[in-house]
Amino acid sequence: MQNRHIAMGILLLSLLLSSWLYWGSDFKLEQVLTSREWQSKMVSLIKTNSNRPAMGPLSRVDVTSNVKYLPNGTYLRVSIVKLFSDDNSAESVINISEFGEWDISDNYLLVTPVEFKDISSNQSKDFTDEQLQLITQLFKMDAQQSRRVDIVNERTILFTSLSHGSTVLFSNS
C-alpha cells in the first residue's frame, strides 16, 4: 500500500515537472507558430522636414503580411507594401515575397532571410527606382530583427522588438 502511494507521488511529480517544462519551453512556441498561417498589418506615418527626402514624397506606408512558419525551420512571407505620397492620393504598391530560416531560442524568434523577390507588376510614378530600392532595403533590414515571442491566445501572438516596438500577428483560421 505504501509503495503504491510512493509510485503515485513520483508519477504526479513527474507529470508536474513535464508539464512545467513543456509550457515553459520553446517547444510550445514552435507548436503555436507552425500551427497556422499568420497575418499582420502595419501603418507607418512619415514626417520629414526636407522638401525631397531620399525616399521621395513618402508620407505613409501600409504593410499587410501573411507568413507561414514551417516545421522544418523555414518560413514564407508575402507582403503588400502600399506607399502613399504627400498628397495621399497616388498609391504605389510593392509586392514582396520572402523566404528564409527561423529558430526559437529563449522565447526569441530569430529570423534569417535567405531570399527576397519583388513580385510587383507595376511601377510607381511618384517614386524613382532608386527610392523604391531604398524602401525595399529598409523592409529587408526590418525582417532581420530578432523578436521576443509571447502567446496572447491560440490565434494571437505578440512580437516585441528591441528597437521597433511591437507587432501583433493574428490568425483567422
UniProtKB/Swiss-Prot annotation:
Localization of this protein: Cell membrane
Top-level taxon of origin: Bacteria
GO cellular component, one term: plasma membrane
Periplasmic side: 26-173
Ranges annotated as spanning the membrane: 6-25
UniProt KW tRNA-binding keyword: no
Database matches in Pfam families: ToxS
Keywords: Cell membrane, Membrane, Transmembrane, Transmembrane helix
InterPro entries: ToxS
Membrane topology, as annotated: Single-pass membrane protein
Disulfide bonds: none
Cytoplasmic-facing ranges: 1-5
Function: Interacts with ToxR and stimulates its activity.
Subunit annotation: Interacts with the C-terminal periplasmic domain of ToxR, possibly by binding and stabilizing spontaneously forming ToxR dimers.
Name of the protein described by the UniProt record: Transmembrane regulatory protein ToxS
Organism in which the protein naturally occurs: Vibrio cholerae serotype O1 (strain ATCC 39315 / El Tor Inaba N16961)
Gene transcribed to yield this protein: toxS
